[in-house]
Amino acid sequence: MNNQSNHFTNPLLQLIKNVAETKNLAIDDVVLCLKTALAQTYKKHLNYVNVEVNIDFNKGLMQIEQLFDVVDDNNEDYDDFLEMPLSEAKKLNPNLEVGGVLRKPVSLKDIKGDLISKMVLLFNQKINETAFKTVMSDFINEVGQVIEARVEDIDTNKDGGLKGYIVNLETTKGYMPKRELSKGEKLDIGKKYLFVIKEIQKQSSMWPITLSRSDSRLLEFLLNSNTPEIANGTIEIKKMERSPGTKSKVAVISKDPVVDPIAAILGPKGERIRGISEEFNGEIIDIVIWNEDKLKFLVNAVLPAEVVGYNILQDDERDTSIEIVVPANQIANVFGFKGINIRLISNLTGWSSVDVYTEKDAAEQGIEFTRVNFQPQGIFGIKKRRDKISNNPRNNNQQLASDKVFYTSKANVVDDEIIVDLAKQAEAKRVKQIKQEATKPELQLQQELNLEATPKVAAPTPTPAPQPTPAPTKVEPVPPPVSVTPKPIPKVNKPKPVVKPKSVFSITVEADDSKTKPEKSSAKTNTPQTKQTFDNFDDL
């Protein structure tokens, strides 16, 4: 038999190696794809119906043969694509007999022109199919799992706009489309991020693994990782809804009555929930107490706004709809920025429609509603913290004790320590003001008598002039006016020391229209501002 072998060229050898490394495939798999592509190209485009391709990668040899069945010369009906008369076959191999198989060598030179492009296209198709099978076997059971991976490249369109990100998964590549990003989020090449393996596409010419950072399972993973009480099963996440990058609502329940689920998820000074929020570009995360009763669950989900009343629509078409009545100054908070908050509430609680009215609007439209006669869940620590402030003699602003300040289950409100810190800062500012005011009478008196300022020491027989209000305690002693015997002390109208400080809490309290609004304070704290939660739609 006259065999002809084609030696590999160095570029072809290198091509096989590169494809194997890039697609994370074995050399034998790549060789098999090449053999299949060559054989199909010969059969389809050169009418070489029965072709066999043999490749020895280690020796760098390739053998392509066309196979013919040997038939008797008297057979006039033979198929010249598959069969060859004995006389013709013996010219190529004298040892053949009828019924044998002739192997006729084929040269690679027969593949030329546009056939090369078609063969390469077919080869790439076979490579992708093989790579997909490998990926499927490795990742099919990982769908829904969270992985940490590095962003390798950015995929852009013709105009340079973002299409998505190419992510290195070590054994293969993953792809995250732009739609799977959180709102306003941008990823950096070379940096590691957390991703959810969202799906594996069966038909993909590039990256079959689709990744996501907007999937709710990523939020669930972070809550579980950062909250030991969730990890050990004490707190259970019942349901969650997300508007990625803007706001989320998470319904939870505690299996231990001693464990407050909201406080546990917030963590000390809100550190736990703050870290999770930063992972999603500052996304607001509301923690809601789950309740099997849909009405009570809805009232919990509306917090920190108050549901005054409700009307469940019983007609057949909207049997799961409800109308709720809230105070006029809270209706904007219930809707939220672009209606995001009310959509999350509706989806979370399972009501097909939640219509919101003020009492005035409900009356004008003739809506009869039932008053809410139960206490919503999710106001953790309110009584304890309110009493701390209202019973503290240092704080004269009674508006601090209103429910409006702490009536919330929002994740950006922290625990008692923040309230104590605010009180300390208020006291420090007040002491500073009193010190400044207390020195004014002495300086004015010295100017009247043309006396030099004297050190602050106690006089033997102090006779201070009567004050409108007593000086506060724990303040450095202020010397009384100097007594002069030769002539009477001129009467000086002393300014009243300021006793009532400007409340640092005025930034978080919305005063009623009938009351005087407290003055704004310049005090700065690290505590998230409740007013922003209520009034700033961009933060909802």
UniProtKB/Swiss-Prot annotation:
InterPro entries: KH_dom, KH_dom-like_a/b, KH_dom_NusA-like, KH_sf_prok-type, NA-bd_OB-fold, NusA_bac, NusA_N_sf, S1_domain. Residues 457-540 are annotated as: Disordered. Residues 144-214 form the S1 motif domain. The keyword Cytoplasm applies. Residues 461-489 have a biased composition (Pro residues). Residues 523-540 have a biased composition (Polar residues). Residues 319-386 form the KH domain. It is found in: Cytoplasm. Gene3D superfamilies: 3.30.300.20, Nucleic acid-binding proteins, NusA, N-terminal domain. Keywords: Cytoplasm, RNA-binding, Transcription, Transcription antitermination, Transcription regulation, Transcription termination. One of its GO terms (molecular function) is RNA binding. SUPFAM superfamilies: Nucleic acid-binding proteins, Prokaryotic type KH domain (KH-domain type II), Transcription factor NusA, N-terminal domain. One of its GO terms (cellular component) is cytosol. SMART domains: KH, S1. GO terms for biological process: DNA-templated transcription termination; transcription antitermination. It comes from the Bacteria. It holds the Pfam family KH_5. Residues 512-522 have a biased composition (Basic and acidic residues). Monomer. Binds directly to the core enzyme of the DNA-dependent RNA polymerase and to nascent RNA. Participates in both transcription termination and antitermination. Belongs to the NusA family. This is Transcription termination/antitermination protein NusA. It comes from Mycoplasma pneumoniae (strain ATCC 29342 / M129 / Subtype 1) (Mycoplasmoides pneumoniae).
